Swiss-Prot record:
The modification Phosphoserine is found at S23, S54, S63, S310. The modification Omega-N-methylarginine is found at R233. The modification Dimethylated arginine is found at R233. Gene3D superfamilies: 3.30.70.330. Sequence repeats lie at residues 234-249, 354-372, 374-392, 418-433. This protein is a component of the heterogeneous nuclear ribonucleoprotein (hnRNP) complexes which provide the substrate for the processing events that pre-mRNAs undergo before becoming functional, translatable mRNAs in the cytoplasm. Mediates pre-mRNA alternative splicing regulation. Inhibits, together with CUGBP1, insulin receptor (IR) pre-mRNA exon 11 inclusion in myoblast. Binds to the IR RNA. Binds poly(RG). Part of a ternary complex containing FUBP2, PTBP1, PTBP2 and HNRNPH1. Identified in the spliceosome C complex. Interacts with IGF2BP1. Interacts with CUGBP1; the interaction is RNA-dependent. Interacts with MBNL1; the interaction in RNA-independent. GO terms for biological process: cellular response to interleukin-7; cellular response to peptide; mRNA processing; regulation of RNA splicing; RNA processing; RNA splicing. GO terms for molecular function: enzyme binding; identical protein binding; RNA binding. GO terms for cellular component: catalytic step 2 spliceosome; nucleoplasm; nucleus; postsynaptic density; ribonucleoprotein complex. It comes from Rattus norvegicus (Rat). This is Heterogeneous nuclear ribonucleoprotein H. It is found in: Nucleus, Nucleoplasm.
Length: 449
């Protein structure tokens, strides 16, 4: 619950999904029933490092009652776009505004790039060879891994100068092995945002609207008890410049200091969950029946996605964007029922334009909206027959007593070919889907073999 103004938290909401050309006057009209503090001056737009609108803003209101009125505007439309409204506070607002925009101290030219699409098992040496002739600083490669120690397919690389980093960007879409590699501008701050939220927020924020894993996608961190962030974000380690060289992430739970010299203990305590508007790093379902898409063409639109799933009719589509305002090639699609979400999975590996699209099911039979919190975890199938909705969170990790969650390529992969029984009952309605799961599991295992 937000504290009053006397507690220093103020009365703030965060708005997401604004049209890129949105003005303060348009925001005022959208919240015409609410009293905005200081009028247009109480509307604080969030910008990317390049100075472009991110589609998000903070709005300062005059009282808690005005906040409640503003929250009722959630999912109403502005022009052709629906707008999401979330409760926030001064601490989050001040931190985000300080760390975003073209004048942010975090946007220094420090020679970082982010790689995506690396082959599973790609080593630091292969990355060095890929950038042959371009000087990488000592300990300059960071390879995120998942909680099972496997590569996420992404990496951060720091070059000796920004000029060299610019040359590295020209290798965008070149190949390592059979995979073409995408390369994006990055920064030390982007690496840091995997696990470096304001400490105060870590203890007080309730679950918010942004939650999608992915390296370098905004100011996003999760606190779910010791070690949860390590499992979700990935442990950073490995010979050529892993965080272990800096006493970071080296005790199995991520305690210690990071490569930037800060104590990380606070990142792994509490039961809080908060995000810093990367434009799409988090998606919270209202129905509990979602499909996550990966590998979208960069020019794909919401209409393209609706057409992709035709004749199914998704409830809504959320295309993700990174902190630089560019699309990530991923999206979350919400369906009205579990059956629709399962049926949508028949489009897995189908082509959209020139690219094949991977789908990941995040749906629970019988789930409803409300407190249901959707979380995409790529390595797990989060679909439980007979589970009730309410506060059930689909992101229960392996080894936490949920027998139906099987890791692709892991020892439990054989479960994918059978029914999802256990305490949740059989799942005969999924019988036609088992073969798809087996094929996906085989594909994944062959990739990491």
């Amino acid at each position: 619950m937000m504290l009053g103004a006397e507690g220093g938290e103020g009365f703030v909401v965060k708005v997401r999904g604004l049209p890129w050309s949105c003005s303060a006057d348009e925001v005022q009209r959208f919240f015409s029933d609410c009293k905005i503090q200081n009028g247009a001056q109480g509307i604080r737009f969030i910008y990317t490092r390049e100075g472009r609108p991110s589609g998000e803003a903070f709005v300062e209101l005059e009282s808690e009652d005005e906040v409640k009125l503003a929250l009722k505007k959630d999912r109403e439309t502005m022009g052709h776009r629906y707008v999401e409204v979330f409760k926030s506070n001064n601490v989050e607002m001040d931190w985000v505004l300080k760390h975003t925009g073209p004048n942010s101290p975090d946007t220094a030219n420090d020679g970082f790039v982010r790689l995506r699409g690396l082959p599973f098992g790609c080593s630091e040496e292969e990355i060095v060879q890929f950038f042959s002739g371009l000087e990488i600083v000592p300990n300059g490669i960071t390879l995120p891994v998942d909680f099972q120690g496997r590569s996420t397919g992404e990496a951060f690389v720091q070059f000796a100068s920004q000029e060299i980093a610019e040359k590295a960007l020209k290798k965008h879409k070149e190949r390592i092995g059979h995979r073409y590699i995408e390369i994006f501008k990055s920064s030390r701050a982007e690496v840091r945002t995997h696990y470096d939220p304001p400490r105060k927020l870590m203890a007080m924020q309730r679950p918010g609207p942004y939650d999608r894993p992915g390296a370098g996608r905004g100011y996003n961190s999760i606190g779910r008890g010791a070690g949860f962030e390590r499992m979700r974000r990935g442990a950073y380690g490995g010979g050529y410049g892993g965080y272990d060289d800096y006493n970071g992430y080296n005790d199995g739970y991520g305690f210690g200091s990071d490569r930037f010299g800060r104590d990380l203990n606070y990142c792994f305590s509490g039961m809080s969950d908060h995000r810093y508007g990367d434009g799409g790093s988090t998606f919270q379902s209202t129905t509990g029946h979602c499909v996550h898409m990966r590998g979208l063409p960069y020019r794909a639109t919401e209409n393209d996605i609706y057409n992709f799933f035709s004749p199914l009719n998704p409830v809504r589509v959320h295309i993700e964007t990174g902190p630089d305002g560019r699309v990530t090639g991923e999206a979350d699609v919400e369906f009205a029922t579990h059956e629709d979400a399962v049926a949508a999975m028949s489009k897995d590996k189908a082509n959209m334009q020139h690219r094949y699209v991977e789908l990941f099911l995040n749906s629970t039979a019988g789930a409803s909206g409300g407190a249901y919190e959707h979380r995409y975890v790529e390595l797990f199938l989060n679909s439980t027959a007979g589970a009730s909705g309410g506060a059930y969170g689909s992101q229960m990790m392996g080894g936490m007593g949920l027998s139906n969650q099987s890791s692709y390529g892991g020892p439990a992969s054989q479960q994918l070919s059978g029914g999802y029984g256990g305490g949740y009952g059989g799942q005969s309605s999924m019988s036609g889907y088992d073969q798809v799961l087996q094929e996906n599991s085989s594909d994944f295992q062959s990739n990491i073999a």
